[in-house]
Amino acid sequence: LTWDCVDFSPKSIADGTASIMIEKELQRVDKTAMKSLEQKDVLFIFPQSSKRNTSMLVLKKPKTESSVRKIFIPATVAHQLESWKREQERTKEALGGEYTDYNLVLANGLGHPMERTRIAALLNALIEKNDLPKVVFHSLRHSSITYKLQLTGGDIKSVQGDSGHAQAQMV
């Protein structure tokens, strides 16, 4: 997720249309598989930290058209994102040239992409610190789908669009 895909303008928060546009994904791709990826789908290749790496991180278009979607977010989430953006700006200013700005919402302290394993580790630490039941990160998506089905009275089509599932049976 990049900041240009997040709308948390004061107007969008006030009128309830704050949103995140899902149109990019971070993926670790094997160097040999990179050749078979359609180059038009690759938006950015992140510099490698080591020449010995057998894979590379890329920002690319999602694999299916149904994966591209707009997700509306509540004002509380929009305000959290605003706060996080300000924190990133302060870090960037303090580090100067040491910070590489890739415009990423989830970036480490130097601006580099945060991969799934790091996000999962942070979630696990948060769970442990707060004595919460253990969950896997992906289960949050399923919980969200269940909650949205309840909110919409079982409207599978609208939940399908929100979740990015290509077929209603997948919801």
Where are the regions that the model predicts?
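Short, contiguous acidic/charged loop-to-helix segments that flank catalytic cores in large enzymes
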Residues: 59-68, 107-115, 131-139, 150
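Conserved tyrosine-mediated DNA breakage-rejoining catalytic core shared by Y-recombinases
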Residues: 2-90
